[in-house]
């Protein structure tokens, strides 16, 4: 079983795809393939970020209650 790429690896791959597409010298079929890969990577990255955000919102305050991250940040 292959290891899952890290967030940083996926982000780097997405940046490479974006750079290739921005240069505009990629054949159409390859550009479409790269675009599809980029969309899939973007969705994976978004899911990872949402998971991290949910983890951070479970920060505990002094009373042991869970508080949303925005409230914890405002209390500092």
UniProtKB/Swiss-Prot annotation:
One of the protein's GO biological processes: DNA catabolic process
Name of the top EC class for this enzyme: hydrolase
GO molecular function per UniProt: exodeoxyribonuclease VII activity
GO cellular component: cytosol; exodeoxyribonuclease VII complex
Keyword annotations: Cytoplasm, Exonuclease, Hydrolase, Nuclease
InterPro entries noted in UniProt: Exonuc_VII_S, Exonuc_VII_ssu_sf
Principal cellular location given in the protein's record: cytoplasm
Pfam family, one: Exonuc_VII_S
Catalytic activity: Exonucleolytic cleavage in either 5'- to 3'- or 3'- to 5'-direction to yield nucleoside 5'-phosphates
Annotated localization: Cytoplasm
EC number: 3.1.11.6
Ranges that cross the membrane: none
Subunit: Heterooligomer composed of large and small subunits.
Function: Bidirectionally degrades single-stranded DNA into large acid-insoluble oligonucleotides, which are then degraded further into small acid-soluble oligonucleotides.
NCBIfam families: PRK00977.1-2 (NF002138), xseB (TIGR01280)
Family to which this protein belongs: Belongs to the XseB family.
HAMAP family for the chain: Exonuc_7_S (MF_00337)
UniProt name for this protein: Exodeoxyribonuclease 7 small subunit
Gene name in the database record: xseB
